[in-house]
Design a protein with these regions (language model features):
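Aromatic (tryptophan-biased) beta-strands that constitute blades/sheets of beta-rich domains
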Residues: 15-64, 98-107, 143-152, 194-202, ...
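Repeat-blade elements of multi-bladed beta-propeller folds
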Residues: 27-34, 67-88, 110-134, 158-182, ...
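Structural recognition of the beta-propeller blade-terminating site
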Residues: 93, 138, 189, 263, ...
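Hydrophobic or amphipathic alpha-helical targeting/insertion segments
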Residues: 94, 117-150, 155-201, 318-323
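Beta-propeller blade signature
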Residues: 137, 141, 183-194, 252-267, ...
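Loop/turn-rich, solvent-exposed surfaces of beta-rich toroidal or solenoidal domains
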Residues: 293, 385-387, 408-467
Length: 510
């Protein structure tokens, strides 16, 4: 463990972050992974407009010094930006871009695939580690307060998760595709690090559930969302294991590839909706469950929307999980229809086979971890999508354990796609380049959408039609930009390659 502090004043976090502000975040903050509990990644700020966004310039930049891409979304609380990468977190002064402190986790044998972000509570900041620990640090100095094991990394668990704080519950999930492990979500006391409850998406060890078909998996590796009125947390779950050998786990395999609604005080399941019953293609439904309160075809609804990795867009009533809409938003060829519950019906002819099957989407999916955004004014759900194909092989010699096969992507095209949530129709597409995109999406009330392309540009588009308004080459954008207001000026903050960049309009001359 190491902490490096700069000799500079520490901003206002000395007073600590008030967790009640997560219910209505201030405009000078982005205090949680999604910005607020809804997952919409939409800002009410309007200073940057389609008419002036071309004037954006660099206010400051920060370089991590690491030769790894940043996949985290920064958070901002009380004047401090927190940026993460595997084994690392930086505290950065939002006014200057200067490092306040850096914490480096000891070397470990965990899986260093990426990291999504941090969480704050009072005067602590929390991050997960590649060996499936969670650490509480003093938000002012970066010194360790406690360090707990979320799950056993020696069994094959790891974590990239940005924790979700709900009152005094710190909710955190893990990953683990390479072994037959149950999916877990834990609630941790942010003061002590003690476990409050554990939710299993598939049966825990030494138990059985006849509905599971023997499946394990269903890891909850992405940050969920929360409805304080319903007091429900919504989380997407990952694929079943063995991943490509469906014959070893007959049936639908609940609750893998699902959206689950959980009571944050008890950890009890309230309802579940399965986006990919009996998945055999590694299509997690871990993507962000976006919460929207609006009319749906003339009726006021509390909705949940998800663009899922399997290529389908879902609209649910989040009070009970009932399906309102299921439509494809990316190229798909693996289904034979939609069942009466609104779930895609897998076509057995598209299961992986020893001689290979050409499937769309490919393993990367119709989308992935990169966050979408919902723009309430236009009613558009905007998502970084991919139209792609892959060849899937089931390898009998691998048996019924872990991956149990292989897949090879053969074609893919990245595109930003705007979906009308009422009908599921695509309103516009914006070409992002070849392969799969890595950037998430941010929309603003003024009608600007921010994202990134595969060529290493951060983009500003007109939300109404997807037209390009501005771009800057900062390196590959690995998650969603954020925005905030400081001293009367609106900033856009985005991670590109291994750095962080703050953009702002020129100051008006007096």
């Amino acid at each position: 463990m190491s902490v490096l502090m700069a000799a500079m004043p520490i901003p206002a976090l000395a007073q600590g972050f008030d967790p009640s502000l997560l219910l209505k975040p201030r405009t000078d903050s982005w205090p949680t992974y999604h910005g607020d509990y809804s997952g919409k990644r939409h800002s009410g700020l309007t200073q940057i407009t389609p008419e002036n966004v071309h004037r954006l310039g660099l206010a400051w930049s920060f370089q991590t010094g690491l030769n790894i891409p940043i996949k985290a979304s920064p958070i901002l609380a009380n004047g401090i930006v927190y940026l993460t990468a595997p084994d690392n977190i930086w505290a950065i002064d939002v006014r200057t871009g200067r490092q306040i402190w850096r914490y480096t986790y000891p070397m470990n044998e965990g899986f260093h695939i990426g990291h999504r972000g941090a969480a704050v509570y009072k005067d602590s900041v929390f991050l997960t580690t590649p060996d499936a620990h969670m650490i509480a640090l003093d938000a002012r100095t970066g010194t360790v307060r406690w360090n707990i094991e979320i799950a056993d990394s020696k069994r094959g668990y790891w974590s990239t998760n940005a924790p979700l704080l709900v009152r005094n519950h710190l909710l955190v999930g893990v990953s683990g595709d390479f072994d037959n492990l149950p999916g877990i979500l834990k609630s941790i006391d942010p003061e002590t690090g003690k476990t409050q409850w554990v939710f299993y998406s598939t049966p825990p060890p030494d138990t059985s559930d006849p509905t599971s078909g023997g499946a394990t998996g269903g890891q909850m590796w992405m940050t969920g969302t929360y409805d304080p009125e319903l007091n429900l947390v919504f989380v997407g779950t990952g694929n079943p294991t063995p991943v490509l050998n469906g014959a070893a786990r007959l049936g639908d395999n609940p609750w893998t590839c699902s959206i689950v609604a959980i009571n944050p005080d008890s950890g009890k399941l309230v309802w579940g909706f399965q986006a990919s019953p009996h998945d055999t293609h590694d299509w997690d439904a871990a993507e962000v469950p976006v919460l929207v309160d609006a009319n749906f075809r003339g009726t006021p609804r509390k909705m949940l929307m998800q663009a899922s990795r399997n290529g389908y867009f879902f609209v649910l009533d989040r009070t009970d999980g009932k399906n309102l809409l299921t439509v494809p938003f990316a190229t798909v060829n693996w289904t034979s229809g939609i069942d009466k519950m609104g779930r895609p019906i897998p076509n057995p002819a598209k299961d992986p086979a020893p001689d290979g099957r050409l499937i769309a989407p490919n393993e990367v999916g119709g989308t992935n971890y990169r966050s979408p955004s919902f723009d309430p004014k236009s009613g558009l759900f905007i998502v970084s999508a991919q139209d792609g194909y892959g060849i899937y092989f089931f390898k009998p010699e691998h048996g019924a354990y872990g991956w149990a096969g292989a897949d090879y992507g053969v074609a893919g095209k990245a595109v930003l796609r705007a979906i009308d949530y009422q009908s599921g129709k695509i309103k516009w597409n914006h070409d992002l380049g070849d392969g799969a995109g890595t950037a998430g999406v941010l929309t603003t009330e003024s009608g600007v959408t921010f994202t990134g392309d595969t060529a290493g540009n951060v983009l500003a588009l007109r939300t109404a039609d997807g037209a390009t308004l501005w771009h800057s080459g900062i390196g590959r954008v690995g998650n969603s930009p954020i925005t905030y207001e400081l001293d009367g000026r609106q900033y856009v903050l985005v991670a590109g390659a291994s750095g962080l960049y703050a953009f702002v309009l020129p100051e008006e001359r007096q």
